[in-house]
Amino acid sequence: MSHNVTPNTSRVELRKTLTLVPVVMMGLAYMQPMTLFDTFGIVSGLTDGHVPTAYAFALIAILFTALSYGKLVRRYPSAGSAYTYAQKSISPTVGFMVGWSSLLDYLFAPMINILLAKIYFEALVPSIPSWMFVVALVAFMTAFNLRSLKSVANFNTVIVVLQVVLIAVILGMVVYGVFEGEGAGTLASTRPFWSGDAHVIPMITGATILCFSFTGFDGISNLSEETKDAERVIPRAIFLTALIGGMIFIFATYFLQLYFPDISRFKDPDASQPEIMLYVAGKAFQVGALIFSTITVLASGMAAHAGVARLMYVMGRDGVFPKSFFGYVHPKWRTPAMNIILVGAIALLAINFDLVMATALINFGALVAFTFVNLSVISQFWIREKRNKTLKDHFQYLFLPMCGALTVGALWVNLEESSMVLGLIWAAIGLIYLACVTKSFRNPVPQYEDVA
């Protein structure tokens, strides 16, 4: 019995419709630039008012991993992302476990975004049952993803542009306030980056929290099979998404830090967005921004929905998941329809699910993917392809991915205990499932050979 799934020339495949700009917009929508207002209070408290520097540290750390993604996308332009890279570069067993763990990140991300939207709606319209909002939003998200990835990309492009415009408007009000004497009282200051009471360790601690603001930049690697010239476009898109997102975070928090030099004005620093809107722009603007925040989390949910459906499609095509369901592509829409519907059904759990638990699941999956993408570069290029002869080889295929792995290691150290426990339980379930698929590992792990 063969356990390698060979390509079928008559099978329905995903349609290539995306170019660089839509892919970057998908990544930025996933990241949600507006999240900078949510995390500002807690990180400002941790760093004694040096949030921009913490973001700079986080950006540098993330860019190492972004470079690793770029190298592997050129080698394996498949929709499977970290799953495919670990499968081909290290081993099919490791690849499955990475893919299984990554499902925690991707599978629950749409639900978390719907859950956040539900929370916003409950604050705006408490008289309407929240389950109605959840069902309506999930139906909208699923319908868009079913029809085409291009429509999702177009929707997300509009939302990202509007987010940037809204951030610019808020920053305009912040600048005006500082100019009129609020906060630091000056627009030119090095204090948001460094001051006499600055300490590196708290900034690194803040950076570990802010790194999770970048979660999602990697998800666009799942769009490789629907992107024209993916070997060139996807690596650039991944790097640009992380870089542009990071620059927005640093630029915006510089001015916010001038307006709020410390956290003394915040009643609840852990949920600073509503208070920032209230202090800077007033009650009416706060309500409007809350409504728009609902739309931004929906856009992020749509991007996550698209990504996980394609990861499940690749795992189904490989045969590690039932192929007839997970490997199905709709003949007209050319989308993984069954997976999209399944993810939509899981997102309905937002009707009654704990946000803290869902977030814990996501963090574990993201760190597994980041770690093994960096290790896959070393395994594939430095070890397997023996690109270890020159100083340039050592720098590109050993030093840079090692830096990426070490920076991710700092995130592992700061991972919540609940994330680790839930993640390990999920990994154990995956290992048991894999043992069943391979008949106690006597048979090889199924894999699709078209990408090698």
Curated annotation (Swiss-Prot):
Major place of residence: membrane
Gene Ontology molecular functions: putrescine transmembrane transporter activity; solute:proton symporter activity
Domain of life: Bacteria
UniProt catalytic activity: putrescine(in) + H(+)(in) = putrescine(out) + H(+)(out)
The entry's keywords: Amino-acid transport, Cell inner membrane, Cell membrane, Membrane, Symport, Transmembrane, Transmembrane helix, Transport
Residue intervals on the Cytoplasmic side: 1-16, 70-95, 145-158, 221-237, 305-339, 382-394, 439-452
Ranges in the topological domain labelled Periplasmic: 38-48, 117-123, 180-199, 259-283, 416-417
InterPro entries for this protein: AA-permease/SLC12A_dom, APC_superfamily
Pfam families on file: AA_permease (PF00324)
Regulation: Putrescine uptake is inhibited by carbonyl cyanide m-chlorophenylhydrazone (CCCP), which dissipates the proton motive force.
Subcellular location, record wording: Cell inner membrane
One cellular component term from this protein's GO annotations in UniProt: plasma membrane
Topology with respect to the bilayer: Multi-pass membrane protein
A GO biological-process term: putrescine transport
Residue ranges of the TM segments: 17-37, 49-69, 96-116, 124-144, 159-179, 200-220, 238-258, 284-304, 340-360, 361-381, 395-415, 418-438
Role summary: Putrescine importer. Required for induction of type 1 pili-driven surface motility.
Cited PANTHER family: AMINO ACID TRANSPORTER-RELATED, LOW-AFFINITY PUTRESCINE IMPORTER PLAP
Family: Belongs to the amino acid-polyamine-organocation (APC) superfamily.
Name recorded for this polypeptide: Low-affinity putrescine importer PlaP
Species this chain originates from: Escherichia coli (strain K12)
Designated gene of the protein: plaP
